[in-house]
UniProtKB/Swiss-Prot annotation:
This is Protein max. Disulfide bonds: none annotated. Residues 1-13 have a biased composition (Acidic residues). Residues 56-65, 119-132 have a biased composition (Polar residues). Phosphorylated. One of its GO terms (cellular component) is MLL1 complex. Residues 14-38 have a biased composition (Basic and acidic residues). Residues 86-107 are annotated as: Leucine-zipper. Transcription regulator. Forms a sequence-specific DNA-binding protein complex with MYC or MAD which recognizes the core sequence 5'-CAC[GA]TG-3'. The MYC-MAX complex is a transcriptional activator, whereas the MAD-MAX complex is a repressor. It comes from Danio rerio. PANTHER family: PROTEIN MAX, PROTEIN MAX MYC-ASSOCIATED FACTOR X.
């Protein structure tokens, strides 16, 4: 018997069954490490997204996961309230806009009818004014003979008196 024969070592590491278990365990450990790293990265990302915690990565005492979740929850609730307020403001502005558009349409309608009336009355008045813009009687025929700009004395005839000589 040799020295090697006396020491028989049951080595499970050499058996195919152990390689399968060891590989499974190593694979499981790698997956678990990857999962924990992903969770850790997600918490860091969440921490960096919350304004109240943005300076925490440089501070001596970092926020715990529970603190990160609490602050994130508070921030989400705050943003929901703010979003709701903004939505109400948007709805109010839409109502105001609709009201103003309705008023504009009403004013344009009034303006249109006023312009039509002005055009109609200006066309009517052109029948009763001479080219100088002076009022003319409908029975006058449009002559300039009696313009309002002449003094009263010039419009009336002066009587000629023969002098006694």
């Amino acid at each position: 018997m040799s020295d090697n024969d006396d020491i028989e070592v049951d080595s499970d590491a050499d058996s195919p069954r152990f390689h399968g278990v060891a590989d499974k365990r190593a694979h499981h450990n790698a997956l678990e490490r990857k999962r924990r790293d992903h969770i850790k990265d997600s918490f860091h990302s969440l921490r960096d997204s919350v304004p109240a915690l943005q300076g925490e990565k440089q501070s001596i005492k970092q926020a715990s996961r529970a603190q990160i979740l609490d602050k994130a929850t508070e921030y989400i609730q705050y943003m929901r309230r703010k979003n709701h307020t903004h939505q109400q403001d948007i709805d109010d502005l839409k109502r105001q806009n609709a009201l103003l558009e309705q008023q504009v349409r009403a004013l344009e309608k009034v303006k249109g009818t006023t312009q039509l009336q002005a055009n109609y009355s200006s066309s009517d008045s052109s029948l009763y004014t001479n080219p100088k813009g002076q009022a003319v009687s409908a029975f006058d025929g449009g002559s300039d003979s009696s313009s309002g700009s002449e003094p009263e004395e010039q419009r009336t005839r002066k009587k000629h008196r023969p002098e006694d000589s």
